[in-house]
């Protein structure tokens, strides 16, 4: 989940799940709003509530070069996740261009044509930083 919903919706399903995969895209609220159309306040509030109700929560981070892979964002993200006691794992989901042809097939414009996937070096740098902060890190979905 991206976590952007009323808390009541979470409470309806959390009693049935042990594991939640929770996406965090950007920790700066204004930048999150620019990228997604909504700020991240509700998302962060829900993350803090969800983690108290489940056995395990894994944070998933789509890594999109020049949009959310900055050192500042990664540092803020790890600082926030460090407050979520049950989170031990962060999954990095590097941007790829595998869906470009699908956009063409349905007559839609692909808006990220100018963005290339992150380099292995960049991914490994981010992975090492997060591991050094005490988290298990997996790359890919």
Predicted segment positions?
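A cross-taxonomic marker for long C-terminal extensions/tails that follow the last structured domain
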Residues: 121-141
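Short, flexible active-site recognition loops that position polar ligands and cofactors
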Residues: 112-122
């Amino acid at each position: 989940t991206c976590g952007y919903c009323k808390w009541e919706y979470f409470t309806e399903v959390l009693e049935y799940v042990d594991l939640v995969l929770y996406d965090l895209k950007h920790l700066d609220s204004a930048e999150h709003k620019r990228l997604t159309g909504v700020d991240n306040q509700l998302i962060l509030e829900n993350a803090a509530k969800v983690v108290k109700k489940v056995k395990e929560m894994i944070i998933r981070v789509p890594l999109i070069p020049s949009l959310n892979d900055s050192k500042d964002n990664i540092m803020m993200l790890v600082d926030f996740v460090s407050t979520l006691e049950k989170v031990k794992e962060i999954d990095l989901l590097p941007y790829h261009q595998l869906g470009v042809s699908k956009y063409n097939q349905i007559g839609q414009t692909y808006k990220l044509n100018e963005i290339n996937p992150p380099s292995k070096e960049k991914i490994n740098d981010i992975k090492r930083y997060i591991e050094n902060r005490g988290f298990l890190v997996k790359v890919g979905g």
